[in-house]
Amino acid sequence: MRNIIISIVFLLGISSIQAQTVKEDLSEFPETMLSDMDSLYWDWQSKNLIYLDENCRMLPEGPKVSDSVYIDRLSRIPSIIEMPFNEVVKKYIEAYTGRLRNKVSFMLAAANFYMPMFEEALETYDLPMELKYLPIIESALNPKALSRQRASGLWQFMLRTSKSYGLETNSLVEERFDPQKSTWAAVRYLKDLFNIYKDWHLVLAAYNCGPGNVNKAIRRAGGSTDYWDLYPFLPKETRGYVPGFIAANYVMTYYCEHGICPMESQLPAVSDTVHINKDLHLQQVASVCNIDIEQLRSLNPQYK
């Protein structure tokens, strides 16, 4: 019989930059930047696993930053993917460091748990490490995120794409919610997209809106494969996707300079797996392993 893998927690505590001109009004914030973290999952996480650090005083607003400082800071981020600065990128950076600063604080805590698994998969497939911040704009690091278009999980897979990469969805399991399996599937998908486009900005756009829409934008842009030439021909939300990705890399690197404190996290520093060869209820597993059932559910969000 096929083994079922359940995560169990060990509670151990826890390129050159160029200023470009792009019309700002063509951009739209990705859905996760506009939505509140109000799902039952994040409600439980925030009440039980993530909390404010009493020793860190987060400023209500960050300092004013000049364009030249933004350009300099972006140039110092070690990256293979180009991170240009323009007015659209600036708008996204100021959103993350301004009205979304509490969300950033929350994501910094969750990142301690998720980033190691992202980094392992990216290193295995020899992909740019800065892609580990893609789920920041995809799902705000919510493994049970569900978009209006029914994209699901940390990496926001649509059902058809997820099945192409071996993720299972049925009455008992939704593997798009599985942090490990969805991460490895997403990295394989990104690798395949790069083999098609050979340009990381186009890969990011295709990941968000699909290769068909990117190919259509290329035709409408007269055959150009420069992302900023394609920009006005992309779907509205995708126009803000690359700027949002650049801003996510910026804020996850320079949050201290903007007076943003990471929340403290009791998410496990290390987890392990138990292989089960027959049907069991999670409550049975929790009882045998002496683990709180809600924590077990949070570590295994793929099970319905």
Please state what every model-predicted region is.
Residues 1-24:
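Bacterial Sec-dependent N-terminal signal peptides
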Residues 18-125:
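An acidic, Gly/Ser/Thr/Pro-rich helix-cap/linker signature
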Residues 88-91, 106, 110-113, 117, ...:
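Extracytoplasmic/secreted proteins, especially bacterial periplasmic and envelope-associated proteins
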Residues 92-106, 140-148, 156-198, 218-232, ...:
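Substrate-binding clefts and substrate-entry loops adjacent to catalytic sites
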Residues 127-144, 203-210, 296-300:
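Short, functionally critical alpha-helical segments immediately adjacent to catalytic or ligand/cofactor-binding
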Residues 234, 299-304:
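Extracellular LysM carbohydrate-binding repeats and other cell-envelope/extracellular binding modules
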Residues 236-258:
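Catalytic cores of secreted or luminal carbohydrate-active enzymes
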Residues 263-293:
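Primarily a LysM-type cell-wall glycan-binding module
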